[in-house]
Amino acid sequence: MNPIVEFCVNNLASGADAAFAKLDADDSLDVIEYDCLTYCDLCATSLFALVDGEVVRGETADELVANIYTFLEENPF
């Protein structure tokens, strides 16, 4: 079973789409897009994803990707 990375479609439209594309190319991750993750305040102010249910944030798409991989290293599945 792979780690699950979940994105909100609205956050993708705000710039997280580049992070989604990079992570989706990684076969060791299950990357999923949802209509809404109900984190509207967070979604309106930063790029983020849920990684195995935990919020991971980034100022840019590249930083978000780096933070997700760091989170996964620090929290082995």
Swiss-Prot record:
Instruction: List the disulfide bonds in this chain.
Output: none
Give the Pfam families listed for this entry: DUF1450
Q: Which family does it belong to?
A: Belongs to the UPF0349 family.
Q: Please give the name of this protein.
A: UPF0349 protein lwe2340
Source organism: Listeria welshimeri serovar 6b (strain ATCC 35897 / DSM 20650 / CCUG 15529 / CIP 8149 / NCTC 11857 / SLCC 5334 / V8)
